[in-house]
């Protein structure tokens, strides 16, 4: 029996529709857009209730149920937003129950993680230097560029 492969999954722009969360926040607080437009990740509470990416809940469950992978969260949390780490953990719990219990890494150095795959929308925070294979996901919320793996169906096609 072979060992399971290790898969790290980023949150913002991969599990979580962070772009939609930012848009929604600015629609609700238009008078603050100028102040926060260059650093939306410092907005308290922004990470608590954003919507999941389309198809992500089902896709992650399929990866888990395949028995081929050990799944972990690998995300960064803004240093200037003390509540963001807890908000992210609670978001995971709300959407995945105990699937990621004690399987969450909050780091700005994803290159230090050992594993087979990293699903991330960006190459920042060490993702571009990850020791395994980077599966660059979706449409980058910062620059709008579509990656090789534009959605969760394409990730499942690659891994299952």
What are these regions (language model features)?
Residues 16-18, 24, 71-73, 80-84, ...:
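Short catalytic/ligand-binding loop motif for oxyanion handling, primarily in non-cytosolic enzymes
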Residues 2-6, 50-51, 58, 62-66, ...:
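Charged phosphate-binding loop/patch that engages nucleotide di/tri-phosphates or the phosphate backbone
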Residues 103-129:
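Conserved Lys-Pro-Asp/Glu-containing loop-to-beta segment of HAD-superfamily phosphomonoesterases
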Residues 1-47:
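Active-site neighborhood of HAD-like aspartate-dependent phosphohydrolases
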Residues 11, 74, 137-139:
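Generic beta-sheet signal
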Residues 119-153:
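Acidic, Mg2+-coordinating phosphoryl-transfer loop and its flanking beta/alpha structural elements
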Residues 51, 56-86, 92:
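Substrate-recognition element of Asp-dependent hydrolases with the DxDx(T/V) motif
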Residues 72-79, 89, 93-112:
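A short, structured active-site edge motif that brings together acidic residues
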């Amino acid at each position: 029996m072979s060992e399971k492969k290790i898969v790290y999954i980023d949150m913002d722009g991969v599990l979580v529709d962070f772009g939609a969360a930012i848009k929604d926040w600015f629609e609700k607080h238009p008078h603050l857009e100028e102040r926060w437009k260059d650093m939306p990740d410092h907005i308290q509470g922004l990470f608590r209730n954003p919507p999941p990416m389309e198809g992500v809940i089902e896709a992650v469950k399929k990866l888990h149920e395949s028995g081929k992978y050990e799944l972990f969260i690998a995300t960064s949390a803004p240093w200037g937003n003390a509540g963001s780490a807890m908000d992210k953990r609670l978001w995971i719990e709300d959407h995945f129950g105990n699937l990621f219990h004690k399987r969450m890494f909050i780091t700005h150095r994803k290159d230090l993680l050992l594993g087979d795959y990293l699903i991330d929308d960006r190459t920042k925070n060490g993702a571009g230097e990850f020791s395994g294979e980077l599966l660059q996901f979706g449409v980058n919320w910062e620059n709008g560029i579509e990656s090789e793996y534009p959605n969760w169906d394409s990730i499942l096609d690659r891994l299952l």
